[in-house]
Amino acid sequence: MNPLRSIQHNITTPPISGGQPLDAVGPQAQQSHPKRISPSQLSQSAHQALERLSANAEHQRLASLVRNALQDGTFQFQSSNHTQVTYKASICLPADTDTVRTDHLINNELTVQARLNDQSEYDIVSAHLHGSSKAISFDVPSPPPAHGSASSVLSERTHLGMSRVLSQDAVDSSSPLLSSPDHSRPPSQHIGSVRRDSDSLVSDNPVVQALLSFAQADQQFPTQAASIAGVQLEMRPRRDIEKALEEFKGAFTVEKAQLMSGANSSERVDEDVNADIHIPLLLKAIERGAAAFGPNALIGQNSAKAFLASCAPKITSNDDVLSEFINRKLKGDDDLQVRLGAQELLHVATKKEFQLGGLAGSIGVSSILGSAWELGASELLKNAIFGKNFSPSQYALQLAGIDSVPPLMIESMDTMCVLAIIKGMKGEEWSMSDLLPKALKAGAISSVVSFPNNVLQYAGFKSKVGDLAANSMTTEAAIFGAASGIPPEVKESEELMRAGLFQSMKDGVMAHPGEGADTKKTIERMTRHALDIAPGESTAVKSMGLASIVGMIPLIASNKATGLLSEQVLRIFRSTVFNPIEAIALNALALGGRVNVPGLFDSDNAKHARVVQTILARASQHMEAGDRDISAEELHQMLAPRSEFLRHVGSAIVNGMNASFEAIPALVRKLGYGEAPLAERIPYQDLAVPDTSRQPAP
């Protein structure tokens, strides 16, 4: 059956066959054609032909491409003869969204043949889409000359350039948008099929469904929307989100904060903090929209609100009516655009990247030095000092002291690699001079803390249960000592972020928590929520929990417990796995964030998709921006669920270790020596009065 129905005209014209030449209309051969052709230059008959093709499921996509190219002005003049003119456009169908099975149609040429009628308007004769190996085309009969007085029916025909089978293969309207093997889908991209269900539109993708619910919350979709099968809807980044995130971070990095003087709490001194607060700012923007920012939240000459709105995802579809309707709804809702833009940036800001360099360095240092010590140097040194047939129990303390020396070097170098991994995950620059003091301190702690465990390797308790309990405690202590560079790093990030948030509120960058709110508790909660999802700190904390579990394997497999592995094998395990456990755990957790097991644990992408759903659902329920707020705890639960066992274990370990590290300095301060730490010098009480002296003039 002919897919195009006849079009009625007021004159009589014979049907045009496939091989019949088209007669020139007017001075066609001498006509100077424009370099580009636009919709305004088409005849009414051409528009009608495209509309009728758009209503046909088989050719809807090609007609849509022609209309889009006309509107964008991408059709360029190619050639002309005595009968028609040819225009061509390059169509780059997204390689990661195969709207027409683009495994064969990635690089496409779209050509249109047209002829100029007596009204100086162009009638479309045919259109062709040429891919790398296949082509799709349709022919439209030439409309009659404008003069004449009879009427007849034009015989319109359509043919598929290669074969009708191509229509089934290349334009399968029931297939979902496929992912190109050569291009990874952006993490914040959401694609779903759309179909009509009674008077509403529904989708198989939860995020797309939430978007449809918002768009039709107060009015129905046009009847033309999704009127055919195979309609797809896509949310994808509007701009270069990585670059936008760098702009956002740069604008809201707090370089100095006004803190209490160590000598006099009533005095304020400017202190370098270089605090990164972009994650808590983005969280607050998702929670409160534009109300999250104060009057001085600027990125260059633009407000933070306008900047985030420009980062909101764009909506595309192979149904122009559908995409136009939804985009119009989104553009009219500034608050929703701000929240969606903030979520786009947050998704990228919390993305965890695999750090191969740091992992290779850690394994290399630990394996080479550790194996050299465990499998050779240790025995040679001890034999040289105590003789070949010495009794280990007789020299337990001396032997333990010797075994405690290598960690000073090995763990110092390993901590350098671990801290470099954390900095890399955070996207921060680092230098050897910055990390070396921290690494040497961690190496010294590891050397001291490993001593009790080393003693028990040579002299244990008579009771097997007591010996196992003692070994378990000292092994965990040794694990914590080996990872002692992580807790101070997390604490430093926490203190700097608190100071940065305090100063941003004081400077009118971030909105004040509100009258009656406890500003200290608010800032502490914001900091905790941000660090729970920050790529560096959150992974570091979880790695402590993972290391505390995996690090017990050598003890469990030894002859002190199950005896599953020989001492020789355990030595190799300790050198290759136990020593670099923090670096291995950090990268394993980064990769684990990409794994999604429904009902068990969610990937990072799944968590952020749930946030987008919540934002859209709240907008659907409350069309007024002021009623859409998402509570801080609700958002935190979506991004850092309570079910994250390793986070809870790691947090307990990190907090406990930091408390033990702080015990002696706190005692010294009580005796009147030393300066209070940064966290204790933040004057939260100052937020009760706006600091107008530091705010720029309007």
From Swiss-Prot:
Compositionally biased, Polar residues: which spans?
Answer: 1-15
Q: Which UniProt keywords apply?
A: Hypersensitive response elicitation, Secreted, Virulence
Comp. bias (Low complexity): 172-181
Q: Kindly list the places in or outside the cell where this protein is found, as annotated in its UniProt entry.
A: Secreted
Q: Where does this chain mainly localize?
A: secreted
User: Which GO biological-process labels does this protein carry?
Assistant: symbiont-mediated perturbation of host programmed cell death
- Give the residue ranges for region: Disordered: 1-36, 171-200
Q: What do the Gene Ontology cellular component annotations say? A: extracellular region
User: What is the role of the protein in this entry?
Assistant: Effector protein involved in non-host recognition.
- Protein name, UniProt field: Effector protein AvrPphDPgy
Species of provenance: Pseudomonas savastanoi pv. glycinea
Q: What is the gene name?
A: avrPphDPgy
